[in-house]
Design a protein with these regions (language model features):
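A structural signal for multi-pass alpha-helical bundles of membrane permease subunits
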Residues: 1-222
Length: 222
């Protein structure tokens, strides 16, 4: 939804569209590990920018990722990771939706304007249905991307996926567990576990792809 709103806003201001498009796309071509480390610094308990802003408005500092003074909750860590993922994935989604918007025939909007249709109704009745191929594609690829997430955890939480104060990798993802088993799993069967997990992940992605094909035929409007 956020990427759609930004794409619509960019499409409505053609004068600065190229400049803004470049600015929004920069995070996508930046090294993900480097961005994650920047986020880890921003959400640092003692000297992070986010806690500094919270304290400026009279609030108490939050243990986002944990520190020597306290342990962060799972949901605080998850919030930081989600903010990073959204910020990092947003440029690609905006670019796809913006290209879709520019391919929509302007006659639809002209007819809606003559009929006195509101902007909200135009968005929900014209723009969204005609962008359904791009929207469905982004939804499915985002779902698949969630299974493959690895860089964000390593960059923000660390290679052990264990926040400060915890004894177990509560932030471990599917790919993280596969990688840990490849490095050396329990009982010397790490490579076997990783191979089985990779096969299972492949099957899940194939099922999602099949569902995508089914949904596209039923709900996508060209």
């Amino acid at each position: 939804i956020l990427s759609l709103l930004i794409a619509v806003a960019l499409n409505s201001i053609p004068k600065f569209q190229k400049v803004l498009q470049t600015i929004f796309f920069l995070p996508y071509v930046t090294n993900t590990i480097a961005i994650g480390m920047v986020f880890a610094v921003m959400f640092d308990t003692n000297s992070g920018l986010i806690n500094t802003l919270i304290e400026m408005f009279g609030g108490d500092p939050v243990e986002w990722l944990g520190s020597a003074a306290g342990t962060a909750s799972y949901w605080h860590c998850m919030f930081v990771v989600l903010v990073y993922i959204i910020w990092n994935a947003l440029p690609f989604k905006i670019l796809i939706l913006l290209s879709g918007l520019q391919s929509i025939d302007k006659q639809y909007y002209q007819a809606a304007q003559i009929d006195g249709t509101s902007k909200f109704r135009t968005l929900t009745r014209i723009t969204a249905p005609l962008l359904s191929p791009q929207i469905i594609y982004l939804m499915i690829t985002s779902f698949i991307g969630a299974f493959k997430e690895y860089n964000s955890i390593v960059a923000i939480i660390g290679p052990t996926a264990t926040p400060y104060g915890y004894q177990s990798p509560i932030m471990g993802t599917v790919v993280w567990y596969l990688y840990q088993n490849i490095k050396g799993g329990k009982d010397g069967f790490g490579m076997g576990y990783a191979a089985a997990g990779s096969l299972l992940l492949f099957i899940i992605i194939m099922i999602i792809t099949a569902i995508n094909s089914r949904i596209s035929k039923k709900f996508v409007h060209y």
